[in-house]
Design a protein with these regions (language model features):
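Conserved hydrophobic "DFG−1" position in protein kinase catalytic cores
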Residues: 9-10, 17, 84, 101
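A conserved beta-turn-beta hairpin within the catalytic core of GNAT-like acetyltransferases
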Residues: 24-28, 57
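Active-site-adjacent beta-strand/loop module that shapes the phosphate/pyrophosphate-binding cleft
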Residues: 58, 68-90, 98-100
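Conserved N-terminal beta-strand and adjoining loop/helix that marks the start
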Residues: 1-16, 36
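NUDIX/MutT-family hydrolases
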Residues: 83, 92-122
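The catalytic Nudix box helix
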Residues: 32-64, 103
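Conserved beta-strand segments that form the floor/walls of ligand-binding pockets within enzyme
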Residues: 16, 31, 81
């Protein structure tokens, strides 16, 4: 099982989603940004690090939302979601090929990675 964290970043009643780039697992699917927890890190530390590395933003991690466990064909992912706020920086893509701020009413227009879907339903 892989432990992963994701951020639900809300700004002006919209939240940030990112699209997985070609050649990545689940390419073309949308997700809440985040990444794998490294040994010795708390979920909150991992989330701050991943958002800085992948999107070049500094964030404040807020409340825990919930955990989603999803069994993909080759791996089981335990995904923990937290609210987060951007403190500084503008979103710059390095791993993903697109980022969008969307409203909850727009969610149905995007195909999300299966592990992220429970957070949308929340």
């Amino acid at each position: 099982m892989i432990d992963v964290v994701a951020a639900v970043i809300v700004k002006d009643n919209k939240f940030l989603i990112t699209r997985r780039a070609p050649k990545l697992n689940l390419e073309g699917m949308w997700e809440f940004p985040g990444g794998k927890i490294e040994k010795g890190e708390t979920p909150e530390e991992a989330l701050k690090r991943e958002l800085a590395e992948e999107l070049e933003i500094e964030t404040e991690v807020g409340n825990y939302i919930e955990t989603s466990i999803y069994e993909y064909p080759n791996v089981t992912v335990k995904l923990m979601a937290y609210f987060a706020t951007v403190i500084s920086g503008e979103v710059k893509l390095s791993v993903h090929d697109e980022a969008k701020w969307i409203s909850i009413s727009e969610v149905e227009n995007y195909k999300f990675a299966p592990a992220d879907i429970p957070f949308i339903e929340k």
